[in-house]
Structures are given as structure tokens and as C-alpha cells.
Amino acid sequence: MNERSINRVELQGRVGTVRIQSIGDQMVSTFSLQTNHFYTLNDGSAKVCETAWHCICAYESEDVVTAGLTRGSLVHLEGRLRTNRYTAADGSERTFTEVIAATLRVVE
């Protein structure tokens, strides 16, 4: 199957918790990213802020270290989605989706 598909994500938001670790020769940075979506209710009565938290993983990203990525930093990133499966302590199968960052830039 050689169908063309697209798996691309572009996000800009504020950084939450940052964790940088070395796994063998590879540097891996994981952090949470908060994004907000604003909209007005259909009746126009109120503006609503919908907040989402995303799990971000950056492999060998010197940008994360050299940019001084910290909680509250505003960042812009591009990457792709990856879904992982694992077995929880209670034996149930769980899945989670994370963004694998390809490019990362600290905006402020």
C-alpha cells in the first residue's frame, strides 16, 4: 500500500512541565503544551475559552535545551501524531497520543 497520507500537526501555546533526559546517545525532551481555542456561544451570550493540553516529545532537539524552554514559555512547533499502547497496572489496555516535534521555536 503506497497511498499518500498526511500526518502533520502545528501548535502554538504555553509550556507546562518540562522533562529532559538522555537515553543512551539520544536526548529526549518531553513536555506538556497548553493551547486555547476561543469561540462565542451560538446565542452570542458569552465567549468561551476551551483549553487543551498536549503531550510533546522532541528527540535530539537541541532547540529545547539551548532555547531555555521553561514553564510558561510560548512555543511554536510542527510535528506529527503518534499513538502508543500500554498495559495499565490493572491489566487494561490503554492508548495515548503524543506529538513528535520536528521543529520547535520559542516565541517568547
Please report, for each region that a protein language model flagged, where it lies by residue.
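Single-stranded nucleic acid-binding surfaces, predominantly the OB-fold ssDNA-binding core
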Residues: M1-E108
